[in-house]
C-alpha cells in the first residue's frame, strides 16, 4: 500500500513539473547574449560634427519603435538586443518587447540605451527619423531622444517651418536661421539639457521638426547649399530667431516711423508752406525713389535715399509718407531686425523680388553697427564672408505688383 502511495505522489510531481515547463515555454524570454556577433554598425551615425539631441517623446509611459533595416539596442557601445526589419517593438516598464513573439530585453536604469539600424533610420510613434534614438528612464516614465547631425536635423526642420513651394532663396535663409538657432542651443545653450537630457524639442517651443517624412528635394537642397553657415555678431553666435507673418509687408521689413514737424521739413528741403508730400515711385525692393514735396508756390522732387540722409534716418530706404496734423510721418526700413528676427513671409516676398539669401539675412539680422557676419561653424573650414551686394532693382516690366 505504501509503495502505491509513493508511486502516485511521484507521478503527481511529474505532472506538475511538466505543466510548469509548458507554462514557462509560453512566456517571453530575454534575448540571447550572442547579438554582438550579428551587429557590425555603431550605436549612432558616424561623422557627426555637431550632434543634436531632440526630445521626440517626453516623459511618457510607453513608445513604439521599428527599424528600416536590421538594427540593435546598445548599452554604451555593446549591442544587447537584435531588432528585426519590419517588426514593431514596445518600450515600456523598463524593457523593450517584440510584439510578434514577446521576445524582450531589460534596460538598465542608470544608463542610456541607444537604438540604431544599419542605415540609421528609425521609426518612433508613427514617424521616421534620421539618426538613432536614446532612451532615458525616469520613475514610471521614459523619454526618447533623436540623436543626429545638425545638417540632417535641418532637413526635417526647414520643410516643417516653411512651405517647400516657396522661393529657394527664402528656404536658404530659413536654413541658416534654423541652423543658427540650433547651434546656439547645443550643450550649454540648451534650457532642456540639465533636467531632461536633450538640446531641443520638436515644436514651436524651439523649432518645428517632423523628421524624415517632411523632407523634400528642394528643402534638402536649401540645407546643402548653405551647409555649415550660421549668423555671428561680434564673434558670437546670433540665435536665428524667426517668425511667420506679423502685420503687413512693411512691418516684416522692420518698419519704423518718424514724425517730422512741418516747419522742420520746410527748413530741411527749402520748400516753404508745404501742403503735400507724396511718394511718386518705388524701386523693386519697396524703397521710395522719387518723393515730391509740394509747397504753395514751389515744388521739389527729392531722391528717397537723399531725403532719408537729410532727415538723419538710419535706413536703406523710405517706404511711405503720410500727413498727420502738423507733421509728416515717414515710414522707413530700420537698419536691421536682430531682436525680432526673420519674417518667413517677408523673406519669401523679398526672394520673389530678386533678393538672395544673404541679402535677406542681412536685412533681418543686421544691427546698426554692421557687425553681422555669415560664417561657418567652428569645425567647418573657415571662410571669411564678404558683405552681400546691394539688391539690384529689376526693370518695371519684371515687377510682380
Segments the model singles out, each with a brief description of its role:
Residues 2-401:
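Conserved, single-site charged/polar hotspot
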Amino acid at each position: 500500500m505504501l509503495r502505491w502511495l509513493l508511486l502516485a505522489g511521484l507521478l503527481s510531481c511529474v505532472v506538475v513539473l511538466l505543466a510548469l515547463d509548458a507554462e514557462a515555454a509560453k512566456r517571453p524570454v530575454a534575448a540571447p547574449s550572442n547579438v554582438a556577433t550579428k551587429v557590425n554598425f555603431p550605436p549612432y551615425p558616424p561623422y557627426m560634427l555637431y550632434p543634436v539631441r531632440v526630445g521626440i517623446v517626453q516623459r511618457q509611459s510607453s513608445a513604439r519603435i521599428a527599424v528600416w533595416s536590421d538594427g540593435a539596442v546598445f548599452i554604451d557601445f555593446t549591442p544587447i538586443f537584435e531588432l528585426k526589419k519590419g517588426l514593431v517593438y514596445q518600450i515600456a516598464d523598463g524593457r523593450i518587447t517584440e510584439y510578434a513573439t514577446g521576445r524582450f530585453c531589460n534596460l538598465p536604469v542608470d544608463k542610456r540605451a541607444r537604438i540604431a539600424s544599419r542605415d540609421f533610420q528609425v521609426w518612433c510613434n508613427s514617424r521616421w527619423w534620421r539618426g538613432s534614438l536614446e532612451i532615458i528612464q525616469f520613475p514610471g516614465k521614459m523619454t526618447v531622444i533623436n540623436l543626429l547631425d545638425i545638417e540632417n536635423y535641418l532637413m526635417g526642420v526647414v520643410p516643417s517651418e516653411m512651405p517647400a513651394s516657396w522661393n529657394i532663396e527664402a528656404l536658404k535663409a530659413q536654413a541658416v536661421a534654423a541652423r543658427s538657432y540650433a547651434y546656439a542651443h547645443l550643450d550649454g545653450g540648451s534650457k532642456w539639457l540639465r533636467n531632461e537630457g536633450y538640446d531641443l524639442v520638436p515644436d514651436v517651443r524651439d523649432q518645428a521638426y517632423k523628421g524624415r517624412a517632411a523632407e523634400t528635394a528642394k528643402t534638402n537642397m536649401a540645407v546643402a547649399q548653405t551647409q555649415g553657415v550660421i549668423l555671428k555678431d561680434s564673434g558670437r553666435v546670433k540665435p536665428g530667431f524667426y517668425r511667420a507673418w506679423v502685420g503687413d509687408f512693411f512691418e516684416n521689413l522692420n518698419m519704423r516711423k518718424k514724425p517730422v514737424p512741418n516747419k522742420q521739413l520746410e527748413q530741411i528741403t527749402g520748400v516753404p508752406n508745404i501742403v503735400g508730400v507724396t511718394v511718386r515711385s518705388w524701386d523693386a525692393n519697396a524703397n521710395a525713389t522719387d518723393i515730391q514735396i509740394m509747397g504753395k508756390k514751389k515744388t521739389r522732387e527729392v531722391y528717397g535715399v537723399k531725403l532719408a540722409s537729410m532727415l538723419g534716418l538710419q535706413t536703406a530706404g523710405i517706404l511711405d509718407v503720410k500727413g498727420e496734423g502738423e507733421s509728416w510721418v515717414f515710414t522707413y526700413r530700420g537698419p536691421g531686425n536682430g531682436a525680432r528676427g526673420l519674417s518667413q513671409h517677408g523673406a519669401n516676398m523679398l526672394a520673389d523680388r530678386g533678393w538672395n539669401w544673404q541679402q535677406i539675412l542681412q536685412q533681418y539680422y543686421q544691427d546698426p553697427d554692421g557687425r553681422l557676419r555669415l560664417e561657418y561653424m567652428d569645425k567647418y573650414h573657415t571662410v571669411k564672408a564678404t558683405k552681400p551686394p546691394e539688391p539690384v532693382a529689376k526693370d518695371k516690366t519684371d515687377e510682380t505688383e
